[in-house]
Every structure is written in structure tokens, then in C-alpha cells.
Amino acid sequence: MTAAATTTLPEGWCTRRPTLDDVPAILELVHASDIAAIGEPDFIADEVREMLTDPHTDMTRDCWLAVDATGKIVGWTFPHNATGGDRDFAEVYTWPEHGLPALRPLLALIMDRMAERAAELGHDPYEVRSGAVPTEQPLIDALTEAGFVFLKQHARMQMSLAGVSPMAPEPPAGVVVRPIRPDDEAEMRVFHAVIEESFRDTDHFSPGYHAWRQQLAGQSAVLFHEWLVAEVDGRVVGALQSSGPEEEDEGWVSRLAVLRAYRKRGIGEALLRRAFAVYAANGRVKAGLGVDMENPTQAARLYLGVGMTALYRANIYRTYVTARAA
């Protein structure tokens, strides 16, 4: 296959920029891709909106849709770098089989844009990562051809809440687990600070407070009654942030953080157990989260220990681009 062929769309196909009006059609595309790769949908409309409106993402410059000759959306690519740091994430979704001709053209577009984003954000070189489920061989081949190399795996964890009591077990002595007070600005800042500090020694960056609040404001609903803090001697030392629409049957742990000095005391498990109880009380039938299998805090061991299993794993790939002015 020639280089020209890999980045040329079929006759009658085109690319265009997305708008928020496209969210339902984009979600349909992502669900089709998910079902082909892992057997079930694993994305919600709020996540599509979030990816289109994230800090440092401009739909009119950073995102593309591929549209076939009938006008159907068959591909979507976008970046993800909410912190503005020196690492980005390139996502490319295509409709199973039918949308494959859009894969390399979309990847070429987003990678070309990555060089410009590097210059705009002031980073050179600029690290770019991407992901693929091991069964997504066409995507893996395209990433490899584009210079990406395998880095590690992430796992999508899940657990049934059947039989989980809405009353959580007591936390360890000296630890208090309670709901967050979302109307208390000082507590919201402390909550964010715990997450930011706890993730500092991992491979995952957290956006600053303003960007984080901006992300929350863009969600259709924020379920603060499913957010938790852990206190020791009156100090917030652990935080659990949940996400996902209330009508979903899965409670989602988007962030679980415990300050380094308070780890190995059962605080992370206490937060998880309380979250599972809250989810069960709210009628959810399962709990889920994502984890970096190379996380130095050994988070995967905690999740396996409380009964979660890997629904699927995704390979993470990495390359670097040189900054280039637009």
C-alpha cells in the first residue's frame, strides 16, 4: 500500500469538523466500534461531549469526522490533553469494516495537528500516545506504521453489585468516610488537591483546579452524592470521584486517590467499599473503572482484591513529534 493510498479517502467520502449536534451520531459510531472490539458499548454521550469540549481542545481545529458518500459518520478523531502538558493522546474511531478506509486519513490528520499543538502548548518534543484493544489489528497496524511503539496496558475493570449491601463495612479505626460537601468551595479545592497530589507520582496527570471545574461544568449532570472523601484526624487524605448519568446501571469510579503518607492503611479499599454501597443503594447493578496496569501504587492489586475483574485490556502506544508552527 502506498503512502498516498493510506491517507486518501474513497471517492465521495470527506472529512469535516464536528459540532455538538453530532453527539448522537458520534456515539452511535463509538458504540459500533466498542461492540466490535469488546462485545458491548463502553461510552456515553457525556463522554463524547467532554472529549469535544475538553480544555485545550477546539472542535474547529483539533477534531475531524469522516463522512461516507451517504452522509453517514464513519470515523472520528480527536486529541486529549486537558492539562496542557507535554503529552497528548490521539484517539481514532472508525465504523467496523465499513469505516476502515478512513482510519489512516484520520490518523494522518490528527498527527499533523499534534505537531502544531506541540508548538502552541510550548513543548518540543511532544509525546503522543494512543490506544487499541489487542483485537483491533487494523488500528494497531496503522499506529505502528505511523511510528508508534507499544508502551503498556490499561485495563477496564468491572464488578457486579449483586448482593452488595447499601450499608458499607466500617472503615479502619481512625478513618472517616463521608460524602463530599459540594457547596463548600474550600472542600472542593481540597478534594481536587488530594487527587492532583496523589497522581503526581504516577503516569497520569490531573488538570488544574480551574480546568477541572470547567470539565465538570460541561457534563450534563454531576452526581456529587456519589463522591466521597476519607478523613484522618479531620484532614481529607483520600478522595473518590464518580461520574456517569444517574440512569446508567453502572457506577463509575473516575478518580480514586489517597495521599502517599496515608497509603497501606486500607483507606483506598474503604472508599471503594463505600462507593459500591452507594451505587447499590442508587440502583446500579455494577461498578467500573479504568486502571493503568503499570501504576506504581499497585492500584490493580487493590481492585482485584475487592472483587473486580478485567472486562478487557487495551494496549497503549507512544511516539514523539517535533513542534511545528501552524
Describe the predicted segments one by one.
Residues 14-28, 176-193:
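A short beta-loop-alpha structural element at the N-terminal edge
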Residues 143, 303, 308:
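Conserved active-site tyrosine of GNAT-family acetyltransferases
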Residues 128-130, 253, 287-291:
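Conserved hydrophobic beta-strand within the GNAT/NAT acetyltransferase core sheet
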Residues 100-116, 255-258, 264-281, 300-305:
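Conserved acetyl-CoA-binding loop-helix of GNAT-fold acetyltransferases
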Residues 1-7, 81-174, 315-319:
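Acyl-donor-binding surface of acyltransferase catalytic domains
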Residues 30-121, 132, 232-233, 240-250:
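Conserved donor-binding loop and adjoining core beta-sheet/short helix segment
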Residues 200-247, 253-256, 260, 269:
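Phosphate-binding active sites in nucleotide-utilizing proteins
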Residues 156-178, 285-297, 309-326:
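C-terminal "cap" of GNAT-fold acetyltransferases
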